[in-house]
Amino acid sequence: MWDSPIIFTRMRELVQSVSPAALSWAVVAVYIGTFFWLKSRSSKQRLPLPPGPRGLPLIGNSFQTPAVNPWEKYKEWSDEYGPVMTLSLGLTTTIILSSHQVANDLMEKKSTIYSSRPQLVMFNRLSGGMNSSGMEYGKRWRDHRSLQASVLRPWMTQRYTALRDVETKQLLAELLKTDDFSSCFKRMVASLFMTLAYGKRVQYPDDPEIRGMEELVRVKSEAGEASFRATGQLVEYIPLLQYLPSFLTPWKEMCDRICEQFNKTFVDRLREGINAPAWTWAKEVSKHKVARPMSELEVSYTLGTLYEASLTSQQILRIIVLVAALYPEKAAKAQEELDKVVGADRLPAAADVRNLPYIDAFVKEALRWRPFAPLGAPRESIRDVEYNGYLIPKGATILVNQWALDYNEDVFPEPFSFLPERWIANPDLPFSTFGFGQRGCPGRYFAQDSLFISTARLLWAFNIRTASPVEVEDMLRNPSAGAFLSPIPEFDATFAARDAQRKALIEKEWEIAPKESYAILREVEKELTSEA
């Protein structure tokens, strides 16, 4: 793995080498020209845009939008202007959707129109345009999605039980010895993916497999932020800036170097998975008919993209721990259900899911109460559409304000209260954590199955408490949140085995559990073959 401090030193040198005057004049010229071109185009529109707060010439609402937790301000505005609202962020027309009804009308019922992405210049440069998360809607994106779906169909993810069983048993055994739950979650999530994709279990929190992949993703993120602070923000607002000469765009060299590291890592992993002596995702996607015309590199990205997405599961599990620690009376109700259905003589199993409605409600309420992705990921409208007398123009960026959906008092009374019971009283409550339409999370079924069994076993095994006082307000609003994601701040928790019998059972189950990757994958393959 390459030395990130050296990279960032070089990045600073690249940025400092740009003449501020030259860059400023170039930016101003492109910005003003683009503004008047868009202005002349919008003047031809016959329908009005949805209402929204008034902005300033050239910059629109950019300086009215808070840098931290903008979804709360968007909800405040939507309460005034309605569930379909227009913002002007630089040169970008952004439509904010703030109700389940509107989100379903547009993102589900007209999914094809709203399944594209805006031009994410920095993001796509960092991946050479091969990360399906940033692709425009079209054949290439559909091909990548087909390969991902080939290993993530609902019936297939249910057959990964043998691996989930082993990984969650190791998780429980680890938490008997340490309260460092974040590291334990990191290992388990990475191992689930690495085993299925490439045939290699991750057995220790400090395993080189974790460090290497995590470092790569971290450096990508930090480099993206560093260049964003230099010229990246401007290039996202004004994509034409990417075509300026290289001496005015030093961030491109950095993106290309990071992309090379991703390329090598993903291809090396794909080859390992193909050569593994057992069934793997790498083998499955490589032999798929859709993959035949693709390069090896492109096929490798279909799995590499899933790895990056899987990292959010760590944060979701941390939310489960947080609510269990903050609301012990709710965790106790979940434990009552587990004791009645499962007892103390065995671990909860996947087959118990239909008999554990409170566990299901506990998970759904946790993800509603503390959404990890309050603004989801941006979409783009591929053509002009009329909706309720307003124009949603072609090329507009569409954001679903998940925070507004989850904190709508008409749908979720007392939204700041953690109330799993609401899902028992009304099983038809809208649950949209994993997105809408064709562009929703490709791994939603795998994530839900893994999250359910992990939560059931954690609550069956442990009484979870905060190790030091935690303010709920601090957990809901992360001051270091990004533009779209909001991981919860760090906090400490303790895990005490509920009784000696459960502790002994955890130790025994982990002692006799299969730990060799290929043996586990052969069990998975048997399950898949029997279904087929």
Curated annotation (Swiss-Prot):
Heme binds at C441. PROSITE patterns: CYTOCHROME_P450. One of its GO terms (molecular function) is heme binding. Its cofactor is heme. The keyword Heme applies. One of its GO terms (cellular component) is membrane. It is found in: Membrane. The keyword Cytoplasm does not apply. Keywords: Heme, Iron, Membrane, Metal-binding, Monooxygenase, Oxidoreductase, Transmembrane, Transmembrane helix. InterPro entries: Cyt_P450, Cyt_P450_CS, Cyt_P450_E_grp-I, Cyt_P450_sf, Cytochrome_P450_fung. It catalyses: preechinulin + reduced [NADPH--hemoprotein reductase] + O2 = neoechinulin A + oxidized [NADPH--hemoprotein reductase] + 2 H2O + H(+). The chain crosses the membrane at residues 18-38. Pathway: Secondary metabolite biosynthesis; Alkaloid biosynthesis. Its main location: membrane. Its EC number is 1.-.-.-. It is a single-pass membrane protein. Belongs to the cytochrome P450 family. Cytochrome P450 monooxygenase; part of the gene cluster that mediates the biosynthesis of echinulin family alkaloid. The pathway begins with the biosynthesis of the cyclic dipeptide cyclo-L-Trp-L-Ala (cyclo-TA) by the NRPS criC via condensation of L-alanine and L-tryptophan. The prenyltransferase criA then catalyzes the first prenylation step, a reverse prenylation reaction at C2, to yield preechinulin. Preechinulin is the substrate of the cytochrome P450 monooxygenase criE that catalyzes the formation of the double bond between C10 and C11 to produce neoechulin A. This is Cytochrome P450 monooxygenase criE. It comes from Aspergillus cristatus. The gene is criE.
